[in-house]
Amino acid sequence: MKVLANFEDNHKIPTNSGIDNLLDGGVEKGTVTQIFGPPGSGKSNISLVLAVNVAKQGKKVVYVDTEGGISINRIKQIAGEDFPKIVNNIIVFEPTSFLEQNENLKTIELWIRKHHDDVDLCVLDSAVALYRVDDMKSSRLNKELGKQMGILAKIARNYDVAVVLTNQIYSSFDDDNKDVVKAVGGTILQYWSKTIIQLERNDEFNKRVATLKRHRSIGEGKQATFKIVERGII
């Protein structure tokens, strides 16, 4: 049971950028947020900014890096003088196979169950990098992906944690033979994600465009722009 006051702005994690305007304050706790887009569009930067902001408040972050791309130097840039204060608040997992990713998420759920009062954020960056390279048959892969998303949804809902997963894209042709950009993982990730944000690059103006594709209380199609800078995103 919760009182209504528990659903105010402290229920959201800010990004310190235009994305906060897009989401009316930031990424919501208690739900799964999917961020998808092409390489270099800002998915990991948003995730790291969220992680640093949570860690600065003395809360724990669980960060699952499936691409081996987490950069300590980037975290130092974002955190600035607060870096020494946050290093023990960000817990990193680095699975190298889809099955290992599966086991990591089971371990994380058990750990958060014991420490949920201390944890505000769980990041899976990215959800599908290992899914795309695994040798398992697609039917089994999809089944395992669904199980993983179920674990993340449980973490979000049961322990009031903001779950953020990043996702890649692919191109396909629609009925009119037009090239359409879609998120990898299809209906599986779409089903479990309560908030979905699509990122695009605008290299002409050195900006990124974020478009809201799904939200339970904000209209689809709302947009915001942001820039990637040394101290994070603005």
Swiss-Prot record:
Signal peptide: none annotated. Keywords: ATP-binding, DNA damage, DNA recombination, DNA-binding, Nucleotide-binding. It comes from Methanobrevibacter smithii (strain ATCC 35061 / DSM 861 / OCM 144 / PS). Involved in DNA repair and in homologous recombination. May regulate the cleavage reactions of the branch-structured DNA. Has a very weak ATPase activity that is not stimulated by DNA. Binds DNA but does not promote DNA strands exchange. The lineage of its organism: Archaea, Methanobacteriati, Methanobacteriota, Methanomada group, Methanobacteria. Pfam families: Rad51. It comes from the Archaea. PANTHER family: DNA REPAIR AND RECOMBINATION PROTEIN RADB (PTHR22942:SF47), RECA/RAD51/RADA DNA STRAND-PAIRING FAMILY MEMBER (PTHR22942). Belongs to the eukaryotic RecA-like protein family. RadB subfamily. CDD domains: archRadB. This is DNA repair and recombination protein RadB. GO terms for biological process: DNA recombination; DNA repair. The keyword DNA damage applies. The keyword Mitochondrion does not apply. SMART domains: AAA. GO terms for molecular function: ATP binding; ATP hydrolysis activity; ATP-dependent DNA damage sensor activity; damaged DNA binding. InterPro entries: AAA+_ATPase, DNA_recomb/repair_Rad51_C, DNA_repair_and_recomb_RadB, P-loop_NTPase, RecA_ATP-bd.
